[in-house]
Amino acid sequence: QTQQFTNDPRVPGIGFAWLMGRRNGRRVVMHGGDLWEFSTQLLLAPDENLGLFVSGNSSGAAPLADELVKALFDTFFPPLEAAEASGAVQPAGGASALGVADMAGDPRELAGVYRTTRRPLTTADKAVSLLTQFRVAARDDGTLTLAFPPGYGMPMATWTPAGPGLYRDTAGDDIMAFDHWKAVAGKARPSRMYIGTWAFERVPVYETASFTLATVAVIAVVFVWAVMAWVFGRRVSGLAAVLGLVNLAAIAGIAGSLLAIPGWELTTAVPQMTRAALALPPAGAVLAPALVWQNIRRIAAEKRRQRWTFYSRRTTRGLTAIVLPWLVIAADGAFIWLLHTWN
């Protein structure tokens, strides 16, 4: 079994259906598969006449398999010396000749949120990638930390510099490489990250889980404000309140349906309840232009009744009545954009 492809010459690649790699400096070929709360791993060490098959269920199956393989190799096949581990990636120069900063550059350039390139792009399950984002952070000592998505059940990993744009897992033989550098906010940052045979891409800020959740929260607050302003004091028109209520129902329906079903169903199809909730935002998109027209007519009517200034409008109708309808329109547009972003 020989390597046929690699994402980057500095990291292990893939042969004919087998993933190439190293454990404690020893050559291994492996393959695995994971579904929701199920994990299987087959590993062969040809030079050691070793074969291992592990399969398990529940959310802890994947880390359990990794721990078992690590314990087995640490016990029966301890780490080789660097000179013996032929084929292992070595820095271009010893640590004595190259300082950590020279070997790795500025680790802060590598920090960010990444996601695997094996993901849906044009269907609604693209949103599942919100749950599978990896966060890379830089430490003051020049090392990197890799935080796995919450559902993976994997502990945070620490990576030490092993060359320019190259890092090694402190708990194993995995190599992390960064490539495809692009200018972001005036600084050169990598757009790709490779760990073994896995390829990752840097996530744009507007598609990170934190940005998406914060945006949904702000949008929901505006819609709740509109409904409450109409219920208590009629400080906005009924049209603004209805638009807010329709979108709140959509947000609650989408979130509720995704939380109510078993997680594994998300990997097969979009739930019917979610589809029903997604039918509400288009209705809101129809109401939004009507609200714009209503606001314009109201402003025109006030201009005819009196000499119009912002102060006069603020004192006769109140700031909420002036600003909130436009915020509702903006929030509706942001909600439609968000749904379009995630198909």
Task: Show the residue positions of the predicted features.
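Alpha-helical transmembrane segments forming the membrane-embedded cores
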Residues: L213, A229-N343
